[in-house]
UniProtKB/Swiss-Prot annotation:
This is Death-associated protein 1 homolog. The gene is dap. Ribosome-binding protein involved in ribosome hibernation, a process during which ribosomes are stabilized in an inactive state and preserved from proteasomal degradation. Acts via its association with eiF5a (eif5a and eif5a2) at the polypeptide exit tunnel of the ribosome, preventing mRNA translation. Involved in ribosome hibernation in the mature egg by preventing mRNA translation, leading to ribosome inactivation. Ribosomes, which are produced in large quantities during oogenesis, are stored and translationally repressed in the egg and early embryo. GO terms for molecular function: ribosome binding. Belongs to the DAP-DAPL1 family. Associates with ribosomes; inhibiting translation. Interacts with eiF5a (eif5a and eif5a2); inhibiting translation.
Length: 105
């Protein structure tokens, strides 16, 4: 690619126009001239920090819960496990020996 021109080119909408090369448009990125000032640690910035409010008690069915005392992590884990079947399935070998005889056309 050729080097960018030394003189200032006309900008549209605040940026340089795209260059067409090989049938595709290529956007030329330019460096912004705006410098962001560094944030300084002042006493004023610490005054406006928010404090996390204490957790409010949760009411379940009219009773105030006590956090992990009412619902332990182990009890919650059991509630999310897959249920164990009460009856066992038959072995798959019995189903393979059955043949269905159908007449041909």
């Amino acid at each position: 690619m050729s080097s960018p021109p030394k003189e200032k080119t006309e900008t549209r909408a605040g940026h340089l126009p795209a260059v067409k090369a090989g049938g595709m448009r290529i956007v030329q990125k330019h460096q912004s001239a705006i410098e962001v000032p560094d944030k300084k640690d002042d006493k004023d910035s610490t005054e406006y920090e928010t404090v996390i409010p204490p957790k409010l008690p949760v009411v379940v069915s009219g009773v105030v819960t006590k956090g992990d005392k009412d619902f332990t992590p182990a009890a919650a884990q059991v509630a999310h496990q897959k249920p164990v079947p009460s009856a066992q399935k038959l072995p798959a070998g019995q189903h393979l020996n059955q043949h269905i005889h159908q007449p041909r056309k």
